[in-house]
C-alpha cells in the first residue's frame, strides 16, 4: 500500500520535523582542482569591505597594507570593517565592570598554562603550512622541520621543550639577516639493470641547502596557506580556508587559551562547551529573559546572521582587546600575547596551486602557478577571472597576496566570541538607560538576540541600537538573513529551540554506518553511535532497534562476513563456513567471523568480545586474544579509543568507544608508493620520532606519566628515570649488584655521548 508521507507529520510539531529539511543524507560536495579562485575572492572581498581605510607599506616585506580601523562609518547597510578603537575598549571596560575580576583571573590562569605548555602541543592538528618546504604537511612533520631548521641556524632555546622557548626562537629568527633551509628533492636517472638488462628509472633522494634572506623568510613566516573547504553542505559555492605555519600557531594558541578562559566565565558564550552542556547554558539565558519579561513586557528573539564575520574582523582590534585585557599584567606576558594579532595584521595569503589550462584542439594541459599571475597576459582568462586578477595584482608578492585586514576562518574563534558577547552585555538596563533591554547568545559568528520591551516600538528601537552598536565594533548583522520571532522559537548553531531544544536528528545521519577503521573498531563505533543517539538525540527504542539491524547488515556486507549458515556466497564464505562447522558454541563467534548478532538496545555499551566471551570455545578464545598471535595488534591498546566522527556541520568530533585488542583490530600498512618519492626522507623522520616516543613511553608508563614541568630533554628525563628505577629495584633486592652497576654505567655513557655531540 502507498503511504501518504504527510500522515507521518500529523502528530509532529513543525519544529520537530526540521530534520527532514536538512541536506545531510548522501555524500557531501567536495571541491576539485585548485582553490586559487576562492582565495582571490576572499582577498578581494576583504579589501572591498575596508576600502575606505588607509594604505601603508610594510617596511620589511614591502607589502601594501590596508588599515580600516577608525575609518568612516558606513552610510547604510553595506558590510564594513571600520571598527572604532574607543568603542571596542569601552565595550571591554563594561564587560569587566559587570564581571568583576574576569580578565585578571583569566590572565592568571593563562600565565600558568603558558609556562607549562610543551612544544608538542603544536603537533595537534591536521594539515599545516610547512614554510621550510613551502607546502602543506601533517602538523608533527611541519613542527619537526621547523625545529630542525632553527637548530641548524643556531636557534636552540627550543631544546628545553617548552612552547614559550620555541616562540623565543621564532622571535629571534625574524631578526636574522638570513635563514638556511634544507629541502628534500629527488633526482631521476635512467640506468641499466644488471639482472634484467632493461633500462630502469632510479630515484635518489637529495637534500639541498639554500638561504632565505630576511624578506623571503618573513614572507614565509607570515604566510597562511589556503585550501578549499570540503564537504560543506547546503552551499552552492565553495570557499577558501587557511592553514597558518608553525611560527604563528604557538602565539595563536596562547591568545585562544586566554580567550577560552574568558568565554568559560561568560554565560552568553556558546564556546568552548558543546552538546548537552551548551544546550543547558543557552536554555538558562532564555529562561532568564522569559521570567524577567513580566506581564508588562513583550519579548522577541532574533535568529541572527552576520555578513562575512571573518572578513570584517580586524587583527588590530584584537590587539586593542588584548592590550586592555592584560593591562596590569607583567610585560613579558603582554608581549607574547600581542604577537599573534601583530603577525595577523601583516599576514600574506598563499594563492594555492594556480590555474589549470587546457587546449581542446591540441589536447594540452598546463598549470599556471600562482607566482606567474602577477605578470601573465590576461587574454587567456575569462572575464570574471580577469577582474579578480586585476584587482589582486597590486597586492601580490612572490605568489602570495598581502592581506592585512580580516581574519581567516577559524583562527580566533574564542576571542571574536568575547567581542560579540561584549555587545550582548551592553543590553542590560543600566547600560541602555531606557525601557528596552537585551541579552543573547554568541558562538563565534553565530548569535541569537533576545530583546524585551514594553511595546513593539521599544523592541524595534532595541534592535536598531544593537545593530548600530555592532557596526561600531566591525560586526555586520545581516538584515536580510536575520529573522525575528516571539521568544520561545529560534535557532542557534543549528540547535532549534521551541520551549526547549528539539533534537535535530538529521545532523547525526552521516555518523551512522560502517566507519572503515577495522572489523573490531567498526563494530564498536557503530553500536556506540546508536547508543549516543538514544541518549542525546531522541532516537526512540523502535528506531534504534531498526538502526541496529541495518548496521549489522551493512557491517556484514562491508566485511563479507555473513553468518556461517547463510546461502550468500562471498570470497570469505568458504573460510567462514569451515570455522562455523568446527565451532561447538556457534553463538560465541564474533559477527566478523560469521557469528550471530547478540546486540540489542539494552547491551550496546558492552564490547562484542566481552558480550560473547563466556559463549566462546576455548581454542577460539585463545586464537582471538592471544598476545603471541602475530595478528593481534601489539600496540598497547587503551581501554578507550577515539574515533574521529564527521558530524554534518562543525568540526570533526572525537568519539570515544571501547576497544578490546583482538585479531580483528589490525592496523593497515602504509602505502608503499610513498617510499619512492621525495616524501621518503620525511617518512624516515616520522619513523624516528615514532621510535623515540615509544621508547619514552616505556620509561614513563601512562599510569605514572606526569608532564615534566621542569626543563629537561627527553634523554635527560629517561636517564634520570632509569637511575631512580634501578636504585629502587636494587635496594628492594629485585636486581643484582652487577646489573645495577651495569645500568649506572650505561647511563653515564649516554650522558657522555650527549655532551660530545
UniProtKB/Swiss-Prot annotation:
Region of interest: Disordered: 53-82
Main location: host cell
Keyword check for Lipid biosynthesis: no
Protein's GO biological process: DNA-templated transcription; symbiont-mediated suppression of host gene expression; symbiont-mediated suppression of host mRNA transcription via inhibition of RNA polymerase II activity; viral RNA genome replication; viral transcription
Motif stretch (Nuclear localization signal): 187-195, 203-216
Keywords, alphabetical: Eukaryotic host gene expression shutoff by virus, Eukaryotic host transcription shutoff by virus, Host cytoplasm, Host gene expression shutoff by virus, Host nucleus, Host-virus interaction, Inhibition of host RNA polymerase II by virus, Nucleotide-binding, Nucleotidyltransferase, Phosphoprotein, RNA-directed RNA polymerase, Transferase, Viral RNA replication, Viral transcription
Family per similarity comment: Belongs to the influenza viruses polymerase PB1 family.
Protein name as catalogued: RNA-directed RNA polymerase catalytic subunit
Protein's organism: Influenza A virus (strain A/New Zealand:South Canterbury/35/2000 H1N1)
Gene: PB1
Amino acid at each position: 500500500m502507498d503511504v501518504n508521507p504527510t500522515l507521518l507529520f500529523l502528530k509532529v510539531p513543525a519544529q520537530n520535523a526540521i530534520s527532514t529539511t536538512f541536506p545531510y543524507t548522501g555524500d557531501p560536495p567536495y571541491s576539485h582542482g585548485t582553490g586559487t579562485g576562492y582565495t582571490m575572492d576572499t582577498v578581494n572581498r576583504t579589501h572591498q569591505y575596508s576600502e575606505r581605510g588607509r594604505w601603508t607599506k610594510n617596511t620589511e616585506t614591502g607589502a601594501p597594507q590596508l588599515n580600516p580601523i577608525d575609518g568612516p562609518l558606513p552610510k547604510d547597510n553595506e558590510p564594513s570593517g571600520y571598527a572604532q578603537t574607543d568603542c571596542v575598549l569601552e565595550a571591554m571596560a563594561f564587560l569587566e565592570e559587570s564581571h568583576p575580576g574576569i580578565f585578571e583571573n583569566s590572565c592568571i590562569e593563562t600565565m600558568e598554562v603558558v609556562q607549562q605548555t610543551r612544544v608538542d602541543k603544536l603537533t595537534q592538528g591536521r594539515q599545516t603550512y610547512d614554510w621550510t618546504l613551502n607546502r602543506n604537511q601533517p602538523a608533527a612533520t611541519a613542527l619537526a622541520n621547523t625545529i630542525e631548521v632553527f637548530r641548524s641556524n643556531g636557534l636552540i632555546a627550543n631544546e628545553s621543550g617548552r612552547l614559550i622557548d620555541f616562540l623565543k626562537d621564532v622571535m629571534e629568527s625574524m631578526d636574522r639577516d638570513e635563514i638556511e633551509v634544507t629541502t628534500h628533492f629527488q633526482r631521476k636517472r635512467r640506468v641499466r639493470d644488471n639482472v634484467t638488462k632493461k633500462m630502469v628509472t632510479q630515484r635518489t633522494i637529495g637534500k639541498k641547502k639554500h638561504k632565505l634572506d630576511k624578506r623571503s623568510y618573513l614572507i614565509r613566516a607570515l604566510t597562511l596557506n589556503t585550501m578549499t573547504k570540503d564537504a560543506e553542505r547546503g552551499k552552492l559555492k565553495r570557499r577558501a580556508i587557511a592553514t597558518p605555519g608553525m611560527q604563528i600557531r604557538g602565539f595563536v594558541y596562547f591568545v585562544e587559551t586566554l580567550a577560552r578562559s574568558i568565554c568559560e566565565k561568560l554565560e552568553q558564550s556558546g564556546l568552548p562547551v558543546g552538546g548537552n552542556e551548551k544546550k543547558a547554558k543557552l536554555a538558562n539565558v532564555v529562561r532568564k529573559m522569559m521570567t524577567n519579561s513580566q506581564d508588562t513586557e513583550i519579548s522577541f528573539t532574533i535568529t541572527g546572521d552576520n555578513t562575512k564575520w571573518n572578513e570584517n574582523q580586524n587583527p588590530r582590534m584584537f590587539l586593542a582587546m588584548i592590550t586592555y585585557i592584560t593591562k596590569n599584567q607583567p610585560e613579558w606576558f603582554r608581549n607574547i600575547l600581542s604577537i599573534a594579532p601583530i603577525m595577523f595584521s601583516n599576514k600574506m595569503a598563499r594563492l594555492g596551486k594556480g590555474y589549470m589550462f587546457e587546449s581542446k584542439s591540441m589536447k594540452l594541459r598546463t598549470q599556471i602557478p600562482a607566482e606567474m599571475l602577477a605578470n601573465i597576459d590576461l587574454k587567456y582568462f575569462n572575464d570574471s577571472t580577469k577582474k579578480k586578477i586585476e584587482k589582486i595584482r597590486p597586492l601580490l608578492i612572490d605568489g602570495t597576496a598581502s592581506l592585512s585586514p580580516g581574519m581567516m576562518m577559524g583562527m580566533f574563534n574564542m576571542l571574536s566570541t568575547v567581542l560579540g558577547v561584549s555587545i550582548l552585555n551592553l543590553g542590560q538596563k543600566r547600560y541602555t538607560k531606557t525601557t528596552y533591554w537585551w541579552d543573547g547568545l554568541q558562538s563565534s559568528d553565530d548569535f541569537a538576540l533576545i530583546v524585551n520591551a514594553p511595546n513593539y516600538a521599544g523592541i524595534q528601537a532595541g534592535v536598531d541600537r544593537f545593530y548600530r552598536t555592532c557596526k561600531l565594533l566591525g560586526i555586520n548583522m545581516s538584515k536580510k538573513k536575520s529573522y525575528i520571532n516571539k521568544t520561545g522559537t529560534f535557532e542557534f548553531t543549528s540547535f532549534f529551540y521551541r520551549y526547549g531544544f528539539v533534537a535535530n536528528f538529521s545532523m547525526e545521519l552521516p555518523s551512522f554506518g560502517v566507519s572503515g577503521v577495522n572489523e573490531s573498531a567498526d563494530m564498536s563505533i557503530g553500536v556506540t553511535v546508536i547508543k549516543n543517539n538514544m541518549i542525546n538525540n531522541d532516537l526512540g527504542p523502535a528506531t534504534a532497534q531498526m538502526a541496529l539491524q541495518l548496521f549489522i547488515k551493512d557491517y556484514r556486507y562491508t566485511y563479507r562476513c555473513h553468518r556461517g549458515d547463510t546461502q550468500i556466497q562471498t570470497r570469505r564464505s568458504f573460510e567462514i563456513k569451515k570455522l562455523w562447522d568446527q565451532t561447538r558454541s556457534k553463538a560465541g563467534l564474533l559477527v566478523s567471523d560469521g557469528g550471530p548478532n547478540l546486540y540489542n538496545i539494552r547491551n550496546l555499551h558492552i564490547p562484542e568480545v566481552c558480550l560473547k566471551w563466556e559463549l566462546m570455545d576455548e581454542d577460539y578464545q585463545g586464537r582471538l586474544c592471544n598476545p603471541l598471535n602475530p595478528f593481534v595488534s601489539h600496540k598497547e591498546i587503551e581501554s578507550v579509543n577515539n574515533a574521529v566522527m564527521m558530524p554534518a556541520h562543525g568540526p570533526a568530533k572525537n568519539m570515544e568507544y571501547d576497544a578490546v585488542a583482538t585479531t580483528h583490530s589490525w592496523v593497515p600498512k602504509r602505502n608503499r608508493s610513498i617510499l619512492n618519492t621525495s616524501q621518503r626522507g620525511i617518512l624516515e623522520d616520522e619513523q624516528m620520532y615514532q621510535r623515540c616516543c615509544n621508547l619514552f613511553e616505556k620509561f614513563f608508563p601512562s599510569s605514572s606519566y606526569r608532564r615534566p614541568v621542569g626543563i629537561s630533554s627527553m634523554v635527560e628525563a629517561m636517564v634520570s628515570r632509569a637511575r631512580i628505577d634501578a636504585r629502587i629495584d636494587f635496594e628492594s633486592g629485585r636486581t643484582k649488584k652487577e646489573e645495577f652497576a651495569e645500568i649506572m654505567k650505561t647511563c653515564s655513557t649516554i650522558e657522555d655521548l650527549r655532551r660530545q655531540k
